[in-house]
Amino acid sequence: MYFSYIGYFFLPPLVAVPAAAPPVCQPKSATNGHHPVPRLSISSRATVVARMEGASQGGLQTVMKWKTVVAIFVVVVVYLVTGGLVFRALEQPFESSQKNTIALEKAEFLRDHICVSPQELETLIQHALDADNAGVSPVGNSSNSSSHWDLGSAFFFAGTVITTIGYGNIAPSTEGGKIFCILYAIFGIPLFGFLLAGIGDQLGTIFGKSIARVEKVFRKKQVSQTKIRVISTILFILAGCIVFVTIPAVIFKYIEGWTALESIYFVVVTLTTVGFGDFVAGGNAGINYREWYKPLVWFWILVGLAYFAAVLSMIGDWLRVLSKKTKEEVGEIKAHAAEWKANVTAEFRETRRRLSVEIHDKLQRAATIRSMERRRLGLDQRAHSLDMLSPEKRSVFAALDTGRFKASSQESINNRPNNLRLKGPEQLTKHGQGASEDNIINKFGSTSKLTKRKNKDLKKTLPEDVQKIYKTFRNYSLDEEKKEDETEKMCNSDNSSTAMLTECIQQQAEMENGMVPTDTKDQGLENNSLLEDRN
């Protein structure tokens, strides 16, 4: 039974799609000058696959990958297990009840007929089963019943062999019959496959004409191609169901005396080549069938198999097309996603680099402005403090300068040398008192060089209040240099945050508005207090 499915799907001679479609499947009137639309038919060149894949494919089929085969195998196994569980749940209770019923019937028969032993009863039942397996009904008078091997019945049995249906209600019992059945099936099944192919081609022609008319009508109404294909498929299946399923089911219900469910069950099981054999047309020994009844049933099986083969082939083609289109769409989506990711990554890197450069430049400018403002404010404060000293006190500071020196390039303003010396009280003029405040402050601002060049003897002879003022200026200069170094390090680091930029800008704004930092104000107040005490 499974061989029929293999033939329908994998062997070209056995599939109902063998030859070129007749030209009537694509009439010129149906095209209206446009490209022909994919049509549902049984012919191989009129199938959906041939039209949707295009002539570039050349009819070549790709080999299925092992991963796909394993995945399908797993799905089939799961499907089989599910079906087995459902059938067991539905049929096992009935089987158990039948076992109990036959056991009770046998016990009751032996109780009513004491003269019959259990062994004799079992022998009688076994003979009845053998007769039934041989095709002889043990019910009623078997001598008056029709033979299972008359010409009509034998013809019907031969048809079930080459169609691979195999109902199983009758089977050859002799060795000669079994050997002939093997040879008959080997040569008959391929021959029947060719016949199915020819009938399928003719059915494709008939349905192709009908579907072309339907497509022409819908194309005039400007219906989309997808809707046309869906409607054509539905009409194709409905027409086949009416001709090959509904009408035969009604006939079998009337002749065989079956219910509607049993009739439809027999039709579907037969046309799918399953053939359980529990229901067989012409197999009721109590009905006198006409001689032409069984040959007519076999002819219906022939045409119905061709139709069902076309339906199954069409479903398989649609699945292949959908699978291929899905793979192509997934590939396109992956390509677009990769391209989009690359573009976004490049844009992100460029934006990050640009922002990093801008932030770094702003931080550098802010740090430079802050350093210059601090230096300017510190110089102003020192100059103001020195101006408050008397000429005698300033002469003492002038004595500390034993040699000429200048500020470092880092601390000097505009890299100018500081060559100005403080003069004594007798040499101090009005011009000397107010001249070059910047050079004076730069000398005292360079604490490192001042420490190296200062005269230790003069330092020891300085008064205590002057030493306090000197230490205050020195500590203040050291603190200022440390703050400037820390600010430059923070501004030059790669991981500087925008918070530092905000702080620098705020401090710059405060300095531009004339606000003096708190530490500078405190230091100035302390210097003023020391000077007042000294005076």
Swiss-Prot record:
Residues 410-438, 510-535 are annotated as: Disordered. One of its GO terms (cellular component) is plasma membrane. K(+) 1 binds at residues 164-165, 273-274. One of its GO terms (molecular function) is metal ion binding. Residues 164-169 are annotated as: Selectivity filter 1. K(+) 3 binds at residues 166-167, 275-276. The chain crosses the membrane at residues 69-89, 179-199, 231-251, 296-316. The keyword DNA-binding does not apply. Disruption phenotype: Double KCNK2 and KCNK10 knockout mice suffer from chronic cutaneous allodynia which can be partially reversed by treatment with topiramate, a drug used to treat chronic migrane. K(+) 4 binds at residues 164, 273. Detected in dorsal root ganglia (DRG) neurons (at protein level). Each subunit contributes two pore-forming domains 1 and 2 which assemble to form a single pore with M2 and M4 transmembrane helices lining the central cavity and M1 and M3 facing the lipid bilayer. The transmembrane helices are bridged by the selectivity filters 1 and 2 carrying a signature sequence TxTTxGYGD that coordinate the permeant ions. Up to four ions can simultaneously occupy the selectivity filter and at least two elementary charges must translocate across the filter to convert it into the open conformation. K(+) channel that conducts voltage-dependent outward rectifying currents upon membrane depolarization. Voltage sensing is coupled to K(+) electrochemical gradient in an 'ion flux gating' mode where outward but not inward ion flow opens the gate. Converts to voltage-independent 'leak' conductance mode upon stimulation by various stimuli including mechanical membrane stretch, acidic pH, heat and lipids. Homo- and heterodimerizes to form functional channels with distinct regulatory and gating properties. This is Potassium channel subfamily K member 10. It comes from Mus musculus (Mouse).
